[in-house]
From Swiss-Prot:
The gene is pom152. InterPro entries: Ig-like_POM152, Ig-like_POM152_1st, Ig-like_POM152_9th, Ig_POM152, Pom152, TMD_POM152. This is Nucleoporin pom152. GO terms for cellular component: nuclear envelope; nuclear membrane; nuclear pore; nuclear pore transmembrane ring. The lineage of its organism: Eukaryota, Fungi, Dikarya, Ascomycota, Taphrinomycotina. It is found in: Nucleus, Nuclear pore complex; Nucleus membrane.
Length: 1250
């Protein structure tokens, strides 16, 4: 009785229901039980069908009683609901299943005997005898020892090895001796045991073989990397620090098989570098001046051609420059090097390995330094021809520091990297006098010194060195031809007041100025006049003032003054020797009258006490001439017209040296008048005049003013008709005579008087002007066509410029300033303005023709995919930027969209890489050419002073094509077919391209694996009929592939293995051969014949004179011989060839003995090979030669060989060993063997397997 535990008392399952619920656990338990019972039945059937009769049934019984008991005992331990039985129930279940097992083992024998008795009649089989009637084969004796051994050939996936699978390029830094690179070697479907690679030195081409095996290789494999997505691939890395070409030579895997090596290579070169060769030692910066040209030199090292990118900071902006196609002189790289993809460069295609050596190239970088400050050049990237690139990000950060105000003057100039170049551009100094000129001289007092003020806009901290020349007074400052009296050099600081002290009068001229680094420019005014002013003096003459009626009414003191106005005179008037206050009067005239008109009568003394002027202090006067005593007891008058109102202030006029001047004087009184006046120059009396006039308005003519100084015209006295002469006390007229007339001249710091600039630029011709602003300058311009034009300019700066926009010759014609006409110092002086030439290009290596304004250059035609380039020579001021358009017109006359490209270089030659990807005609139209002077100038070529647009034409021919027309067709030939007959099959090949063609064809024998190549030349047809070669008519299947086709253009195309191939099958004509060469047979044995061809076969033979017809669906015709006799085989035909083969003479044969054969000495051998390799299968015979045998290749199975894939029969073996080479996977077994007399097997079962 089966009992279950109540649900309320049932314990929880061993596996919690939260993980697997109870129904699912029951399902799993029942499933295991069913599986055990099913396997029990299978085990029973296997036991009963075993050929080993003495296997005991007790073993089966004990085994399954134990298995069932274990299962039933363990089941309650899981406490599965509804399957959790009590121990008593479990014991009962074990007993029941033990009884069932006993019943099965005891009843099985009877059951199989009864089944066998029913099925036996159906398995009995009869065979045909030689007389074509069926007989019982029980008389056939089985002897398995006659054929021993089995050869299993497994073709493993083809193991491959490839160095540098990603086609990377490697480089080593020449400065780092401890640097290594990791060369990748990738293995596919294999594990290496031995590696041999070669290293070719780039300099000497010396090849060194290196072997890696044992512990070294195991260490590399342990650190190898695998791709999770491609587990068959494994990559190891070889460390090396030697430059050169690396290739794999030999690889052996763990099966001791050679591994196929892909054609690949790894190149290790020196990393490209770029340093500035013109750096000063210690990395110190160079010193330059504004306007200088800095000639830096960049040393580039690496595999040419190289590309260099550098940036520079000019104090305000960053500029990026790219230098393309940097190559050494006389450098002619292989065409493939010009490919845009460095991975196209492979040295096994015939490129000289020494081309990969490093070249050292010096590239000039010429820069016009336009602004002061620190200029920085930094290399940011260098790339060589192989794609190796060195970047310098730290240099970008270095440049950014300068953008934020850092300079090397801050103390880190010694830390400049080698690929950073620095030049400090200093401001050029200038110098001029301030507050002193020819017109405004400086005063030098006796026994003293005076300070001359200098001005400079120079803003640097460095001191200036100023050269000053002194000339004697009296020379013309504008035309000094004598040597200076002295030359002195002064050190001044431009950031503070700059003064020089002089102790001698003269003409001081600034001759030069320079700073610590730069020469400078002397600006106007550059001349300072230093004079010693005269001491203040006065002469006094007293005259009584009398009236005709009243007599003396006072006195007049006439003061004649010498010195520098204004004058201050101290005087006093005393009466009767009584003291009185001192009075002062100030005047800027050289003559002055003091009128003493006492109001009261008395005895008076008029005293002139002292004098002072603008330069000298107060000086007391003494002597009788400076006072007058008088006892005091209208008049004729004259004044300058400007002071008719009685104003006593001085009249100031300006005149030019060498001019005259008229001064109107108004006379009062009774005509006629006698007027006396005096002329003073530089406060010294020069001449005195007395004139008569009847007109109250008299014009006083001043003589020619031949000296550049100050003239004072003083009215001394006037007398009218009454005879009363009166001394005058009226205002003077001062005439300031300019010491020089304005002058103009061109200025050139280098005395070339030539300006060169880009066409259309605004240029400034420097002038030097003397005089007072503004200046009115007239000049002429003569063009290149001798056309003359006149122009006028108004200028306000003595260091002005003429702003011009046209080239030609400029000549100064006249100059005048605010008051005087002037002169041109050198009327023959001319200034030349020239345009710098525009850049242009030339292509001397190509033939050209002209059509209109375009010159067409013809580049040699190439084939699609080939490398091509042409050289363009550039003329101008580098660096250059060349722009061109590429237009393709393909073979169908379709015009592709225009593609624009740019090439930059600092050299005068640039290589333009041609595009050959798509067949057609390429037009390379050069549109713009820029250099350092001109931007986007038209790119032209100049021939015989004519400009043309340059267009390069190149035809790219398409690659020829070849393909089989009937790829699905199987071409079948009999082994003895004459392929030269007109009815022989031909293989049609379609050809495309320019005829005649050359074709390379490969024919592979699939049985032997051998490949034969045939080259067919001078093919003119577009459809070529290929005759299969007679020598290739060997048994088996053949694959005909197209390997390469070449057309009349010289273009060759390799045809990939993915393109369909033609399949050819060569079969034998139906043939018959006895399995053995005996004339006697063994009684009871079968008489068997090997049939060659495609079954079914029809065989005609005679037996004891009776003609028989036999058919066979296999390659073996077997008949049991029940009677002695002679068998004569007459003819045979098969299904494949449909031709009947007559056997002449007929084959007569008798079976006599049974031979034996052993494969690989009778052992079961398993050998592994790679795809493409061959294995050797050996067969050893016993018996009487000659031997013949048949063997089969079966498919590989998991436990036993699979179906038969092919069979072969070999006859005429006179040796006891026979070897077969095969590259086809399968299990090779012998089916039959025959010697001179007998064959084996003899029974029909064996025959059916042959």
């Amino acid at each position: 009785m089966v009992t279950r535990v109540a649900s309320s008392e049932r314990p929880r399952p061993l596996v919690p229901e939260s993980i697997v619920d109870a129904p699912t656990q029951r399902l799993y338990a029942i499933g295991v039980f069913v599986a055990l019972q099913a396997y029990k039945i299978y085990d029973l059937l296997k036991l009963e069908t075993s050929s080993i009769s003495d296997v005991p049934k007790s073993g089966f019984l004990v085994k399954w009683i134990i298995i069932d008991a274990i299962y039933l005992r363990l089941l309650p331990k899981f406490r599965i609901p509804w399957l959790s039985f009590q121990p008593a129930a479990t014991l009962l279940q074990i007993a029941i299943f033990a009884a069932i097992n006993l019943l099965l083992s005891s009843l099985s024998s009877l059951k199989w005997i009864s089944i066998g008795s029913i099925l036996l009649p159906y398995f009995k089989k009869k065979e045909l005898s030689i007389s074509e009637h069926k007989i019982n084969p029980n008389n056939v004796i089985h002897n398995s020892s006659r054929i021993l051994g089995q050869y299993t050939l497994q073709v493993l996936p083809e193991g491959t090895a490839k160095i540098n699978p990603l086609h990377e390029n490697y480089c080593l830094n020449s400065l780092r001796k401890d640097q290594y690179v990791d060369l990748a070697i990738q293995f596919n479907s294999t594990i290496p045991k031995y590696i041999q690679y070669s290293h070719v030195d780039l300099e000497t081409k010396e090849e060194t073989l290196v072997e890696v095996s044992g512990r070294s290789l195991r260490k590399l494999l342990s650190s190898s990397s695998k791709n999770p997505k491609e587990p068959r691939l494994q990559t190891i890395y070889l460390k090396t620090n030697k430059r050169g070409l690396y290739t794999l030579k030999h690889v052996v895997d763990k099966s001791k098989l050679d591994v196929r090596i892909f054609r690949s290579e790894a190149v290790v070169v020196s990393c490209p570098t770029a340093t500035f060769a013109s750096r000063q030692s210690g990395g110190r910066l160079r010193e330059r001046c504004v306007g200088d040209t800095d000639n830096a030199e960049l040393k580039v090292t690496g595999v040419a051609p190289l590309q260099v990118t550098y940036r520079n900071w000019d104090g305000k902006h960053f500029n990026t420059h790219i230098i393309d196609s940097t190559i050494p002189d006389d450098f002619h790289p292989p065409a493939v090097v010009l490919s845009s993809n460095p991975k196209d460069i492979v040295f096994y295609k015939g490129i000289d390995i020494q081309w990969a050596r490093s070249s050292e190239i010096f590239v000039p970088i010429n820069t016009l330094l336009k602004a002061p400050g620190q200029w920085i050049y930094a290399v940011t990237q260098v790339t060589d021809a192989l794609g190796n690139s060195q970047q310098f990000p730290s240099n970008d950060q270095f440049l950014l520091r300068f953008a934020h105000g850092y300079t090397e003057a801050d103390g880190e100039s010694h830390s400049l990297p080698e690929n950073v170049y620095s030049v400090f551009v200093h401001q050029r100094p200038d110098i001029q006098f301030r507050g002193c000129s020819i017109e405004s001289p400086a005063n030098l007092f006796p026994n003293k010194e005076t300070s001359l003020s200098l001005y400079s806009s120079f803003s640097e901290y460095n001191s200036l060195e100023v050269g000053v020349d002194r000339y004697e007074l009296g020379l013309d400052p504008q035309n000094i031809t004598v040597p200076p009296l002295s030359h002195k050099t002064y050190q001044i600081s431009p950031r503070s007041s700059a003064n020089i002290n002089v102790k001698k009068p003269g003409i001081y001229v600034l001759s030069s100025v320079s700073s610590q680094y730069c020469s400078g420019e002397v600006l106007e005014p550059n001349t300072c006049l230093v004079v010693t002013p005269p001491e203040a003096k006065v002469s006094v003459s007293f005259e009584e003032i009398s009236d005709q009626c009243a007599g003396s009414i006072g006195a007049r003191a006439d003061l004649e003054l010498e010195g520098t106005p204004p004058f201050t005179i101290a005087y006093r008037m005393t009466k009767d020797n009584e003291a009185s206050r001192i009075q002062y009067v100030t005047t800027d005239r050289t003559r002055y009258q003091l009128n003493f008109t006492p109001k009261k009568a008395g005895k008076y003394r008029y005293i002139i006490l002292g004098i002072q002027d603008a330069n000298y202090g107060y000086r007391e006067l003494s002597g009788s001439s400076f006072y007058k005593d008088q006892t005091v007891f209208p008049l004729a008058d004259a004044s300058f017209e400007e002071r008719r109102n009685g104003d006593l202030s001085t009249v100031v006029k300006t005149s030019c040296i060498g001019d005259t001047m008229s001064l109107p004087v108004l006379l009062t009184g009774s005509a006629p008048w006698t007027l006396e006046y005096e002329i003073f120059r530089n406060n010294k009396r020069e001449e005195s005049h007395v004139v008569e006039s009847k007109d109250p308005r008299y014009i006083l003519e001043v003589p020619m003013l031949v000296h550049g100084s100050q003239y004072t015209i003083t009215l001394v006295s006037v007398k009218d008709s009454n005879g009363c002469k009166r001394s005058l006390n009226t205002a003077d007229t001062v005439i300031k005579v300019r010491r020089q007339r304005p002058t103009a001249t061109f200025y050139s710091s280098d005395n070339t008087y030539t300006l060169k600039s880009v066409e259309g630029a605004l240029m400034k011709i420097p002038l030097r002007l003397a005089g007072e602003k503004p200046w009115y300058v007239e000049y002429s311009h003569t063009s290149g066509l001798n056309k003359v034009s006149h122009h006028k300019e108004v200028l306000n700066d003595p260091n002005s410029y003429l702003t011009v926009r046209k080239s030609g010759t400029y000549t100064l014609l006249s100059v005048s300033d605010s008051s005087c006409p002037g002169t041109i110092q050198n009327v023959e002086q001319k200034y030349q303005v020239e345009w710098l030439p525009r850049p242009f290009l030339s292509i001397p290596s190509l033939e050209s023709s002209v059509k209109g304004k375009t010159r067409y250059y013809e580049q040699n035609a190439v084939c699609a995919g080939d490398s091509s380039a042409f050289e363009v020579q550039l003329s101008g001021s580098g660096p250059f930027l060349l722009k061109h358009d590429k237009i393709l017109v393909d073979e169908k006359s379709k015009t592709y969209p225009k593609q624009k490209s740019e090439l930059s270089t600092v050299q005068n030659t640039v290589l333009v890489k041609a595009d050959t990807a798509v067949p057609g005609v390429y037009h390379y139209e050069f549109t713009k050419l820029s250099d350092s002077l001109y931007s986007d100038s038209d790119a032209v070529t100049i021939v015989n002073n004519q400009s043309y647009q340059a267009v390069v034409l190149q035809r790219v021919n398409s690659l020829p094509k070849a393909s089989f027309m009937n790829v699905e067709k199987l071409y079948t030939f009999c082994i003895n077919t004459d392929v030269t007959q007109s009815n022989a099959q031909l293989i049609a090949i379609q050809l495309q391209g320019a005829s005649p063609f050359s074709l390379v064809i490969g024919i592979k024998n699939e049985l032997t694996g051998s490949v034969s190549k045939y080259t067919l030349n001078d093919i003119h047809e577009s459809v070529y009929k290929f005759a299969f070669p007679q020598e290739q008519l060997t048994l088996g299947k053949h694959v005909v592939r197209l390997l390469q086709v070449r057309d009349a253009n010289g273009c060759a195309a390799s045809i990939t293995k993915t393109q369909p191939a033609a399949k050819v099958s060569v079969v034998e004509m139906a043939s018959l051969a006895p399995l053995g060469s005996r004339q006697y047979y063994c009684v009871g044995d079968r008489l068997s014949f090997a049939l060659q061809g495609l079954p079914p076969f029809d065989v005609e033979y005679e037996f004891n004179g009776v003609t028989q017809h036999a058919t066979s669906d296999s390659h073996i015709l077997t008949r049991l011989i029940e009677l002695p006799g002679v068998v004569a085989m007459k003819s045979i035909s098969d299904h494949g060839s449909h031709c009947k083969s007559y056997i002449n003479p007929p084959i007569e044969q008798i079976v006599h003995d049974i031979p034996t054969v052993r494969i690989s000495n009778g052992k079961d051998v398993i050998e592994n090979i790679h795809e493409g390799d061959q294995a050797e299968i050996s067969f050893h015979f016993t018996g009487t030669p000659p031997f013949s045998f048949s063997y089969a290749r079966r498919a590989l199975g998991k436990k036993r060989p699979g179906k038969v894939l092919e069979t072969h029969t070999v006859t005429g073996i006179n040796e006891y060993e026979y070897k077969v080479l095969s590259s086809v996977e399968g299990v090779y077994t012998v089916l039959s063997v025959q010697d001179k007399y007998c064959r084996y097997p003899q029974d029909s079962t064996s025959s059916s397997n042959i």
